């Protein structure tokens, strides 16, 4: 894969030059969240405001298989590839639990952000911050995407619906 990307870069393929995006969503966690857990120790977290985005052990019990799927998701470059991975998971293990669906949506968000030319996508409350990658800014004064002069806002309150709203926004 690295060799293919390097050859494509040398040929001037724009997709090969695409930078990786970092996704930081304040309403997701990459593991099981308990009542006492919080990304910031001094901040109390209402567990209903946070969704786990991970591959649960009860869904795919074998560690090696979970790692393989995490690797596939990390290497995914577009939404179609993420969809194919989701179908493979469902074929292999059955109905996807909410956490696995959230992980797939979070990965799709990363892929869509990369396609849109963002190197970072973050949420802070209802605010959605999409930072343009170097060389991708529409003008030199704005490093963040703005709609009508403001950062985009999320209207959904429930974490899973927020993920879907971000996907719709990026499409």
Briefly describe each language-model feature range.
Residues 1-171:
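Accessory helical-bundle/CTD segments and flexible terminal tails appended to RecA-like ATPase motors
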